[in-house]
Amino acid sequence: MDIQMANNFTPPSATPQGNDCDLYAHHSTARIVMPLHYSLVFIIGLVGNLLALVVIVQNRKKINSTTLYSTNLVISDILFTTALPTRIAYYAMGFDWRIGDALCRITALVFYINTYAGVNFMTCLSIDRFIAVVHPLRYNKIKRIEHAKGVCIFVWILVFAQTLPLLINPMSKQEAERITCMEYPNFEETKSLPWILLGACFIGYVLPLIIILICYSQICCKLFRTAKQNPLTEKSGVNKKALNTIILIIVVFVLCFTPYHVAIIQHMIKKLRFSNFLECSQRHSFQISLHFTVCLMNFNCCMDPFIYFFACKGYKRKVMRMLKRQVSVSISSAVKSAPEENSREMTETQMMIHSKSSNGK
């Protein structure tokens, strides 16, 4: 996507940090690619997360700590998908926001809530799997669930504390040919922005990644030790399930979140080194990389149901049962409606024949 965007625009030429620098010169390509991408994210994310939520609600009496963290991931993603139609319209219009600054702030709030709630709950899932495998006797099931409830509340409070200030500052900006919303250039005048973003990247990405990797390495060590001591444990499948969950979380985390945060860190270091004076071509390249990496990061919304699929016991069986039930209901409805339609057609035909014969008399 980024290569395609890069090949379909003429690099803008202007003085560094100049007002003549068009950072949205790639809008003709972006207005096609980005709405298609986000439409796909909207459909897959909404259907997948709603399906997961239905399964959770139907089995709420059997909830455990893993299910609880996964539930919060699902709720965060459903909230995010509700804001996508406005973003799709924004990108389709070539980065032009025409529905007011208030709605721009709200969509920005939802976007950042989803991003960092997702990161935090993925971290919680990794820690939960770590406790279940490495220290299974330290916390019993009841204590773990009660502890998980408190952690979930704390995570939401933390995320809202980080994102609510977005409602205070304007998120839209009048450009020469458009009104932009939630774009990086809208924040460039913020004092100490590079340090703020570097700090946010450390807290919201680097630290969770370190925790996830530590949990993963400890779980691997534990599984290998257990397999050596008792080969029968491999047949139970419990350790394999825990390993699959952690591997999936790491893959999703790295693929979705790493490119965006690396792009931010790299650009902020450049700004600090060159005292905020960057060439227009450098700023434009960064803007394109942001649009691409944000698309990749938001695809996380579609991957979270798969995390739930692997992490939660019996989810696959319950989903397949629901789908089979739905198909059988559809087939039975079609079978029942067929005789009714045939009898209705026969009645109408008989009435027409009777009417014609009466007219003939």
Curated annotation (Swiss-Prot):
Result, substituting residue 260 to A/F: Strong decrease in oxysterol agonist-binding and receptor activation
Effect of residue 114 to A: Strongly reduced localization to the cell membrane
Primary location group: membrane
Region (Interaction with G proteins): 126-134
Binding site for 7alpha,25-dihydroxycholesterol: 87, 112, 116, 260
Result of altering residue 111 to A/Y: 500-fold decrease of IC(50) for GSK682753A. No effect on oxysterol agonist-binding and receptor activation
Outcome reported for the amino acid change (mutating residue 197 to A): Reduced localization to the cell membrane and reduced receptor function
CDD domains on file: 7tmA_EBI2
Disulfide bonds: 104-181
Effect of residue 85 to A: Strongly reduced localization to the cell membrane
Biased composition (Polar residues): 348-361
Cytoplasmic topological segments: 58-77, 128-149, 216-241, 313-361
Bilayer-spanning residue ranges: 32-57, 78-95, 106-127, 150-168, 193-215, 242-265, 288-312
InterPro entries: GP183-like, GPCR_Rhodpsn, GPCR_Rhodpsn_7TM
UniProt-reported outcome of changing residue 291 to A: 10-fold reduction in receptor activation
Stated consequence of mutating residue 87 to K: Slight decrease in oxysterol agonist-binding and receptor activation
A Pfam family it matches: 7tm_1
Membrane topology (UniProt): Multi-pass membrane protein
Keyword tags: Adaptive immunity, Cell membrane, Disulfide bond, G-protein coupled receptor, Immunity, Membrane, Phosphoprotein, Receptor, Transducer, Transmembrane, Transmembrane helix
Assembly mode: Homodimer and heterodimer. Heterodimerizes with CXCR5; leading to modulate the interaction between of CXCL13 and CXCR5.
Recorded family membership: Belongs to the G-protein coupled receptor 1 family.
Other facts: GSK682753A (8-[(2E)-3-(4-chlorophenyl)prop-2-enoyl]-3-[(3,4-dichlorophenyl)methyl]-1-oxa-3,8-diazaspiro[4.5]decan-2-one), an inverse agonist, selectively inhibits the constitutive activity of GPR183 with high potency and efficacy. Specifically inhibited by NIBR189 ((2E)-3-(4-Bromophenyl)-1-[4-(4-methoxybenzoyl)-1-piperazinyl]-2-propene-1-one).
Primary role: G-protein coupled receptor expressed in lymphocytes that acts as a chemotactic receptor for B-cells, T-cells, splenic dendritic cells, monocytes/macrophages and astrocytes. Receptor for oxysterol 7-alpha,25-dihydroxycholesterol (7-alpha,25-OHC) and other related oxysterols. Mediates cell positioning and movement of a number of cells by binding the 7-alpha,25-OHC ligand that forms a chemotactic gradient. Binding of 7-alpha,25-OHC mediates the correct localization of B-cells during humoral immune responses.
Name assigned to this protein: G-protein coupled receptor 183
